[in-house]
Regions:
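Generic alpha-helical transmembrane segments
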Residues: 48-59
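Membrane-helix exit/interface motif
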Residues: 29-39, 60-64, 93
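Interfacial non-cytosolic loop connecting adjacent transmembrane helices
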Residues: 36-47, 88-114
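Aromatic-anchored segments of alpha-helical transmembrane domains
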Residues: 22-31, 79-90
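Juxtamembrane helix-break-helix junctions at the cytosolic face
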Residues: 58-76, 81
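Cytosolic juxtamembrane helix and N-cap/initiation of the first transmembrane helix
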Residues: 1-26, 122-143
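Alpha-helical membrane-associated segments of multi-pass integral membrane proteins
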Residues: 102-136
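Short juxtamembrane and helix-loop transition motifs at transmembrane-helix boundaries
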Residues: 7-15, 31-45
Length: 143
């Protein structure tokens, strides 16, 4: 299959792949740190949450490599956008114990702060890729 259009759009699936894989890695790291901070999550719960949170972005990742890029874009934008909104509120704006500015110093505090910031960055970039993909007007031709 050939695509017409600029090379930046042709690289969109690659950029999306990098972002989704980075997001998955940071989410797992973040959940492991949360488990160490609060001891409320078992390993099985961490695994289940990681799978559920990454299910839609990985579906979008697969679709980015097909002719369904617009759908992939909307899935990325929705899933990572929701994560970005929830994470920004929970870790930076709310008065919860998971606020990076109010968290008591401890062994895992720095890693928690790092993962919270990394999640914001990666999810923000993922939303940008989602917008780009959802607005794509490329025509796919089957040889």
């Amino acid at each position: 299959m050939k695509m017409t259009g600029g090379s930046a759009m042709n690289r969109l699936p690659l950029y999306g792949t990098v972002i989704v894989l980075a997001n998955c890695g940071v989410i797992v790291w973040h959940l492991l740190v949360l488990a160490r901070l609060h001891s409320m999550l078992s390993d099985g719960q961490i695994l289940l949450i990681a799978i559920l949170v990454n299910l839609i972005p990985f579906t979008a990742l697969l679709l980015l490599w097909t002719r369904f890029r617009k759908i992939a874009g909307w899935l990325l934008l929705a899933s990572l956008g929701i994560g970005l909104l929830i994470g920004t509120y929970e870790h930076f704006l709310s008065s919860s114990p998971d606020n990076v500015f109010r968290m008591a110093p401890g062994e895992w505090t720095l890693q928690f702060r790092i993962t919270a910031v990394l999640l914001m960055i990666v999810e923000g970039l993922g939303c940008w890729i989602g917008v780009k993909a959802s607005r794509e007007n490329h025509v796919f031709r089957v040889p």
